[in-house]
Swiss-Prot record:
SMART domains on file: malic, Malic_M
Reactions accelerated catalytically: (S)-malate + NAD(+) = pyruvate + CO2 + NADH; oxaloacetate + H(+) = pyruvate + CO2
Entries under InterPro entries matching the protein: Aminoacid_DH-like_N_sf (IPR046346), Malic_enzyme_CS (IPR015884), Malic_N_dom (IPR012301), Malic_N_dom_sf (IPR037062), Malic_NAD-bd (IPR012302), Malic_OxRdtase (IPR001891), NAD(P)-bd_dom_sf (IPR036291), NAD_malic_enz_proteobac (IPR023667)
EC annotation from Swiss-Prot or TrEMBL: 1.1.1.38
Protein name: NAD-dependent malic enzyme
Gene Ontology MF terms in the entry: malate dehydrogenase (decarboxylating) (NAD+) activity; malic enzyme activity; metal ion binding; NAD binding; oxaloacetate decarboxylase activity
Assigned GO CC terms: cytosol
Keywords (A to Z) from UniProt: Metal-binding, NAD, Oxidoreductase
Organism name: Pseudomonas aeruginosa (strain ATCC 15692 / DSM 22644 / CIP 104116 / JCM 14847 / LMG 12228 / 1C / PRS 101 / PAO1)
Reported cofactor(s): Mg(2+); Mn(2+)
HAMAP family found in the cross-reference section: NAD_malic_enz
Record note on cofactor: Divalent metal cations. Prefers magnesium or manganese.
Residues annotated as site: Important for activity: 268
NCBIfam families: PRK13529.1
Length: 564
């Protein structure tokens, strides 16, 4: 327990208003003296409980819920009433509840957002209010915000445009910053930019709570986002801003525009890439191979897939390959087939990842013919197969068996969310490779039984990366998030892998260990920030103390009454 946690907290609120503040409310855990001092007598049942007793009751209530969506709604109601209790409950049941507060259940919660809405959380910034964004930010009840997660809801998981329902993603993401990375909920703020929706189901839904208008795009959209960014810089100049679930047409351009202007990153592009590279590095270490020796095929060439590919290329270069050599080991397949330089419909960020058609002469086919996934597997002979397509079943039995025919222990990563959109299930992949493949998925899966072996499945979850990045940035007071910091995070994650440290188990650590993993990642990220001049240099002791001081644990502090 830190010295801060031992000290009493001076609180100017009292009576019913105190009970309505989720950051301060202790419910039945207010002591007798606190009930007297804060005018709470008669507002709570007589018995005074510990947080352990409250958590036990909450968990028993949780178990009465019939569906995952009901469980999500229940947990969110606790969060909106008592954040300390919510995070203690989450802390004690993290592996069980992470799929409920975030993927895959959060996808359904986003779809049903207007129907299950209970109370306010975060900021809704609508296009019609664009001239009042500074006023809106001043309305935030939290003054010392250190992390903002913002979405425009156009690409929510694999579900597409969800309008303001996308608010469920920043809320869930920030819950994981706290649960996994120890960042106080008092420092976090979820934001949705309501620029309308092109989802006809929402536009025609009488219960939809967002701006009922087609999406703003082009120059109007860019101007609106810039108004928001500039207002954020004025309100919280040192904040870490995370872009979340923007469509690929906007995600990369926004990141490129603002990455050198404020401390920001895009988790879909950079966080996904970092955890994927960390997984690859762990698999390579376990097999006694180098990342630079691998050949990687992607299915899905959007901003997330291309972001992963670029970070793999950077990691290969760190192992001695030049850029051209590294790029020749990456094969990107989308709906049109393998990306090649003779395609006329390539997006800006895809050009550098397209293979030269002239180099593929031995593959057969005429100029302009599509090269489908199976043909790429046969000719490129990859050792790693990564799916970010959002299309169920693309990793067919024929594809996986062809992959396995030339690689004894391939790494297969069907990363698409939610579970219904995964390219292949771990059971299928392991059945088709005689249990020899290494598997990491984007959604949670139970261990798989193959013969007499029970094989744990690593969830290649961004929650292994972004909480540690956030903690490291806050502790070091870094002013930017760089590619070097992301690579440091990936290496730190790989070094925590059970298959590396113990020689067996899953490719990634158990979720039960994620808070300690986040601390290790935070140290690596902070040291890299210092090495690059993005944070003031300190001794290791001072840095470790800063990380511990910023690592919040859900426990109640004693309260003392004060005035404003």
């Amino acid at each position: 327990m830190t010295e801060t946690a031992k000290r009493p907290l001076y609180v100017p609120h009292a009576g019913p208003s105190l009970l309505e503040m989720p950051l301060l409310n202790k419910g039945s855990a207010f002591s007798t003296q606190e009930r007297i001092d804060f005018n709470l007598q008669g507002l709570l049942p007589h018995n005074i409980e510990t947080i352990e007793e409250q958590t036990e009751r909450a968990y028993s209530q949780y178990n009465l819920c019939n569906t995952d969506l009901d469980r999500h709604i229940f947990l969110r109601s606790i969060q909106d009433n008592n954040e300390t209790l919510f995070f203690r409950l989450l802390e004690e049941h993290l592996e069980e509840m992470m799929p409920i507060i975030y993927t895959p259940t959060v996808g359904q919660a986003c779809q049903e957002f207007s129907k299950i809405y209970r109370t306010h959380r975060g900021l809704f910034i609508s296009y019609p209010d664009r001239e009042r964004i500074d006023d809106i930010l001043r309305s935030a009840t939290k003054n010392n915000v250190k992390i903002v997660v913002v979405t425009d809801s156009e690409r929510i998981l694999g579900l597409g445009d969800q309008g303001i329902g996308g608010m469920g993603i920043p809320i869930g993401k920030l819950s994981l910053y706290t649960a996994c990375g120890g960042i106080s909920p008092a420092y976090t703020l979820p934001v949705v930019l309501d620029v309308g929706t092109n989802n006809p189901d929402l536009l025609n839904d009488p219960m939809y709570m967002g701006w009922r208008h087609e999406r703003v795009s082009g120059a109007q959209y860019e101007e609106f986002v810039d108004l928001f960014i500039q207002a954020i810089k004025r309100r919280w100049p040192n904040v870490l801003l995370q872009f979340e679930d923007f469509a690929q047409t906007n995600a990369m351009p926004l990141l490129e525009r603002y990455k050198d202007e404020l401390c920001c990153f895009n988790d879909d592009i950079q966080g996904t890439a970092a955890v994927a590279v960390g997984t690859l590095l762990a698999a390579c270490k376990a097999k006694g191979e180098k990342l630079s020796e691998q050949t990687v095929t992607f299915v899905g060439a959007g901003s997330a897939g291309c972001g992963i590919a670029e970070q793999i290329i950077a990691a290969m270069q760190l192992e001695g390959l030049d850029e051209a050599q590294a790029r020749r080991r990456i094969f990107m397949v989308d709906r049109w087939g393998l990306l090649t330089d003779d395609m006329s419909n390539l997006l800006d960020f895809q050009h550098r990842l397209a293979q030269k058609r002239a180099d593929l002469g031995a593959w057969g086919g005429q100029q302009g013919d599509d090269l489908a996934l199976l043909e790429v597997i046969r000719n490129a002979r990859p050792t790693v197969l990564i799916g970010v397509s959002g299309q169920r079943g693309l990793f067919s039995e024929e594809v996986i068996r062809e992959l396995h025919s030339h690689c004894k222990q391939p790494l297969v990563m069907p990363l698409s969310n939610p579970t219904s959109r995964v390219e292949a299930t771990p059971q299928e992949i392991l059945n088709w490779t005689d249990g020899q493949a290494l598997v990491a998925t984007g959604s949670p899966f139970q261990p798989v039984q193959v013969g007499d072996k029970r094989i744990p499945i690593a969830q290649c979850n961004n929650a292994y990366i972004f909480p540690g990045i956030g903690l490291g940035v806050i502790a070091a007071r870094a002013n930017r998030v760089t590619e070097g910091m992301l690579m440091a995070a990936a290496n730190a994650l790989a070094n925590c892998s059970p298959i590396v440290t113990q020689g067996e188990g899953a490719v990634l650590p158990a979720l039960g260990d994620i808070r300690e993993v986040s601390k290790r990642i935070a140290v690596a990220v902070a040291k890299q920030a210092q090495a690059e001049g993005k944070a003031l240099h300190t001794s290791d002791e001072v840095l470790n103390d800063a990380i511990e001081a910023n690592f919040w644990f859900p426990r109640y502090r004693a309260y003392r009454r004060t005035s404003f």
